[in-house]
Amino acid sequence: MKGKFIVIEGIDGCGKTTQIDEISRWLPTSGLMGKNSKLIKTREPGGSLLGKKLRNLILDNNKNNKPSSLAELLLYSADRAEHVSKIISPALKKEDWVISDRFSDSTLAYQGYGRHINLEIIKNIESIVCQGEYPDLTIFLEISAEESILRRKNFVPDRMESEGINFLQKVNEGFKLIAKEKKWKVISATQNITAISNEIKETLLKTFRN
């Protein structure tokens, strides 16, 4: 019996990190996990040791280091291949639970809908790098591109966060299309933090309670 794999998706500023921290505190006491199961909290890019180095390279805001769209796609894919091999698959095989800030559908949204790379090319690459590991549940925290920018106005942006509102709107629309196609749980991230957390917890209980 494998563990469970949960992914939180959404554009920057939607509150993924805050909610993952809250859910990570709650899940081990929820009664959902096995007695000997551990909870692994991770992220993309940067979930593995190699991934941390790739993250610095991918998100470097130095314009002289900006990769081409195809190179960017392949860097994210390399990060994911290592992430699955070294972190996700081993944890699930041990019946541990994994909660990740982003997974493969972020690549479809950002590099596919945002960068206009052919979606079938991305899907073919992802079918290799994911190695058969796909989320048991994906939750999409939805906010507008305008709200995302407003929330991040006092932070120093990385390269992806510096792309501007037009790019972000395309990515967000991509996420909405993917969410509809794959029947994700969509939660409005304009609510207060507690309301969002409660909705996520209810979703987890409905999905995984025996």
From Swiss-Prot:
Nucleotide-binding: present as a keyword of the record?
Answer: yes
Biological process per Gene Ontology, one example term: dTTP biosynthetic process
Q: Name one GO molecular function term.
A: ATP binding
Q: What EC number(s) is this enzyme filed under?
A: 2.7.4.9
Q: Which PROSITE patterns match?
A: THYMIDYLATE_KINASE (PS01331)
Q: Describe its function.
A: Phosphorylation of dTMP to form dTDP in both de novo and salvage pathways of dTTP synthesis.
Q: Identify its protein family.
A: Belongs to the thymidylate kinase family.
Name under which the protein is recorded: Thymidylate kinase
Native species = Prochlorococcus marinus (strain MIT 9515)
Gene symbol?
tmk
